[in-house]
Regions:
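N-terminal pro-sequences and low-complexity stem/linker regions of secreted or lumenal proteins
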Residues: 1-462
C-alpha cells in the first residue's frame, strides 16, 4: 500500500491487562464523548445486556476511579472461560463477577472487574482516540493471560496456554527478532526496567545485546539519529509491575493492581518524543495496545477463531476463540482525527503489517496466514482510510502530569507472589547466571537481587 511505503519507523508499545470497555468504553457514552460510531458502552449502569448475574444478584458496569486495587484480577485460561460464559455456541460475557468472586472469595457491591474509567483517568488514551485512530474490534489473540498472548504477538504461535514461572518456549524460525534479522530489517527494543523478552527461552544474547537499550536513551537517540540510522521497527517496553526490582522507575504498565495514571504518563512521554521532530513524525506509525484484558469486563464476544497448537507445545487442548477486546490505538500524521477502525484484528495484525512492509505479503508465517484467512486483518487496514498527505498539525497532548489517587484505606493485604511475578524473578536469575557482568551493565537494578552478589572468597585454610 502506498501510505505504508511512506512509513519508515513503526513503533510498538504494548501495555498490560486492560479491556477495551475498561479504558475506552466511555467513548460512546452520552455523558462523555458521545461517539456513536465507537462500539463502547451505552447506559452501562442500567443496560441489562451487560448484567453479570450471580446467585440471583445482578452486577452492572460502574464508573471506577483510577487508583491501585487490592489485588490482581483473575485472567488465567480457566477463569477467562468463566468470564466469557459460553452458552451453547454463544459467548454471553456474563461471568466476570463470578470469576472475581471465585478468585478472591470477596463479595462486594461493585466488583472491580466491572469498572470502567472516564476520560479524566485516561486522558492520553482518550486524546489519541480523538486525534488519531481507535480500533474497537481488536482482540487479544487468546482467551488467557499474558505469556501466551505476548508469545502470539512476537511469533504468531503460543506453545503455552497459561503464565508460569518457566522460560517461554519459542517456535523456531518464527520469533520476531529472527524474522527481522533474516530480512535485514533494523530493529531496537527500548525498555524501562527488566525486559519482558528476558522471559523467553534462548533470548539472553538478544536481551543483553546492543539492540536492547534503556528507555532513558530514547530521547537522545531519536533526536540524534538520522532517518537512515533510525531503526525501522522499535518496541518500547514499560516498567513491568511484576518485575522483582523497581529502581528509578515507577511501574507504568497498567497491570492491576497498578493504577492507569503512570501508564498514561508513559504513553504521553512517548508521543511527545515522537512528535518533537515534525519531519520524523511524518514517517512514523505508533501502535499502542494492551496484551490482554486482565480480567476486566468487556461486552463484545470474542471471535470464533481457533488456534493451532505448535509442535512441542506444553498444552493439548486448543483454544476455540480469541480473547476479549483490548484497547488499541494507532497514531500517525497520515491518519485523520477521530477515525474508528472496525476491522477485526488481534496482535498478529502487527505481524501482518511487518510482513507487508518488509516481505511484500501479509503472511508472516503459516499460523498468521491461517488467522488472516479466518478473518484477522492487518493494521494496514487502518491506513487504507488514511489521508493523501500527512497532516501539518501535531495535536498537543494533555499537559498535566496524571496523579492516580490511592483509593485504599491502609496498606493492601499481604499476598502470595503471583506466577507472573515468579516468572520475572526467575528470568532475572537466569539472566544473571548467563552473564552476570553484562546483565548488571544492561539492567543495573538487578544488583539488588541476592543472586547478583559476588561469591564470598573461599575460607583460608586452618
Amino acid at each position: 500500500m502506498a501510505i505504508l511505503d511512506q512509513i519508515q519507523t513503526i513503533v510498538v508499545v504494548m501495555l498490560e491487562n486492560r479491556s477495551f470497555d475498561n479504558v475506552l468504553g466511555h467513548l460512546s457514552m452520552a455523558r462523555f464523548e458521545n461517539r456513536k460510531g465507537v462500539e463502547g458502552l451505552t447506559d452501562p449502569e442500567t443496560n441489562l445486556d451487560y448484567t453479570n448475574f450471580l446467585d440471583g444478584q445482578g452486577y452492572q458496569p460502574f464508573e471506577l476511579k483510577d487508583g491501585s486495587l487490592l489485588h490482581d484480577l483473575p485472567h488465567n485460561r480457566g477463569l477467562v472461560e468463566t468470564q466469557m460464559a459460553k452458552l451453547d455456541s454463544r459467548y454471553t460475557m456474563s461471568g466476570f463477577a463470578d470469576a472475581y468472586f471465585r478468585h478472591t472469595g470477596s463479595r462486594v457491591a461493585n466488583p472491580p472487574p466491572m469498572g470502567f474509567l472516564t476520560p479524566a483517568d485516561t486522558p492520553m488514551s482518550s486524546f489519541l482516540a480523538a486525534q488519531y485512530a481507535v480500533c474497537d474490534q481488536w482482540f487479544a489473540p487468546l482467551p488467557t493471560d499474558t505469556q501466551p498472548n505476548r508469545s502470539m504477538t512476537y511469533s504468531g504461535y503460543a506453545s503455552i496456554d497459561n503464565t508460569k514461572p518457566r522460560p517461554i518456549p519459542i517456535v523456531p524460525g518464527s520469533f520476531i527478532f529472527e524474522w527481522l534479522n533474516a530480512r535485514g530489517v533494523n530493529w531496537r527494543v527500548y525498555h524501562c526496567g527488566l525486559s519482558f523478552f528476558a522471559l523467553f527461552d534462548g533470548l539472553h544474547e538478544h536481551v543483553l545485546g546492543p539492540n536492547f537499550r534503556s528507555f532513558r536513551h530514547f530521547p537522545a537517540d531519536w533526536e540524534a539519529e538520522s532517518a537512515a540510522e533510525m531503526p525501522a521497527v522499535i518496541f518500547i517496553e514499560p516498567e513491568y509491575s511484576d518485575s522483582p526490582i523497581h529502581f528509578g522507575w515507577t511501574p507504568n504498565d497498567n497491570h492491576p493492581p497498578t493504577a492507569m495514571g503512570p501508564g498514561e504518563n508513559f504513553l504521553r512521554d512517548i508521543y511527545k518524543l515522537l512528535t518533537k521532530d515534525a519531519e520524523k513524525w511524518k514517517r512514523t506509525l505508533l501502535l499502542a495496545v494492551h496484551d490482554e484484558h486482565g480480567g476486566f469486563f468487556d461486552h463484545v464476544p470474542p471471535l470464533a477463531i481457533s488456534s493451532t497448537i505448535p509442535s512441542g507445545a506444553l498444552y493439548q487442548v486448543p483454544f476455540e476463540s480469541t480473547g476479549p477486546r483490548v484497547p488499541a490505538l494507532v497514531a500517525s500524521p497520515w491518519i485523520p482525527p477521530g477515525m474508528v477502525s472496525k476491522e477485526t484484528m488481534d496482535h498478529t495484525s502487527i505481524l501482518q503489517l511487518l510482513a507487508e512492509k518488509f516481505a511484500g505479503t501479509p503472511d508472516y508465517n503459516e499460523e498468521v496466514a491461517r488467522r488472516r484467512k479466518a478473518g484477522i486483518q492487518s493494521v494496514s487496514a487502518v491506513l487504507e482510510e488514511s489521508l493523501d498527505q500527512p497532516r501539518s498539525d501535531i495535536p498537543s497532548p494533555p499537559a498535566d502530569i496524571i496523579v492516580s489517587p490511592v483509593v485504599l484505606k491502609g496498606a493492601p493485604e499481604l499476598q502470595a507472589e503471583t506466577e507472573s511475578q515468579q516468572a520475572f524473578a526467575a528470568a532475572a536469575k537466569d539472566l544473571l547466571a548467563h552473564d552476570r557482568k553484562r546483565a548488571l551493565e544492561k539492567y543495573p537494578e538487578l544488583v539488588h537481587l541476592p543472586e547478583a552478589q559476588p561469591e564470598p572468597p573461599p575460607a583460608a585454610p586452618q
